[in-house]
Regions:
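Short, amphipathic alpha-helical "recognition" segments used to contact nucleic acids or chromatin
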Residues: 3-20
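Residue-level signal for cytosolic alpha-helical hairpin/rod architecture
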Residues: 9, 22, 65-68
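DNA major-groove recognition helix of helix-turn-helix
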Residues: 16, 40-41, 45-48
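Short, basic interhelical loop/turn and adjoining N-cap
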Residues: 21-23, 27-40
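Short amphipathic alpha-helical surface patches that mediate protein-protein
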Residues: 30-31, 42, 87-90
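Short Lys/Arg-enriched helix C-cap and helix-to-coil transition segments
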Residues: 45-63, 67
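Amphipathic alpha-helical protein-protein interaction segments
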Residues: 60-97
């Protein structure tokens, strides 16, 4: 698998900031997995500073809150599945830093 270029990182950041899922970002820029799109997003985010970075982190944090709400609602009757997804969500938050 190819390593995303800086340009791919910037595309990932722009697409994610526009509200695309990591899976949709990966498809759009030719990556194999959503986790690769997330890594590209995070690399681009780390190159940002100050107010721009804060704005991007706040927007991503808001998306993750919305995702948690959807997970808790959708998977309420499947506690093991919900717990697995919430653990994955915790990792997304941890990587966001």
């Amino acid at each position: 698998m190819r390593r995303p270029s800086g340009d791919s990182d910037e595309q990932a950041l722009a697409l994610r900031d526009s509200g695309k899922t990591y899976a949709a970002v990966a498809r759009s820029i030719g990556l194999k997995r959503a986790v690769d799109a997330q890594a590209a997003f995070l690399r681009a985010l780390r190159r940002r500073e100050g107010e721009e970075r804060s704005r991007l982190v706040d927007r991503e944090s808001s998306r993750l809150v919305e995702l948690e709400t959807r997970i808790r609602s959708r998977d309420a009757d499947q506690p093991e599945k919900m717990e697995r997804r919430l653990q994955a969500l915790a990792k997304l938050r941890e990587h966001l830093g």
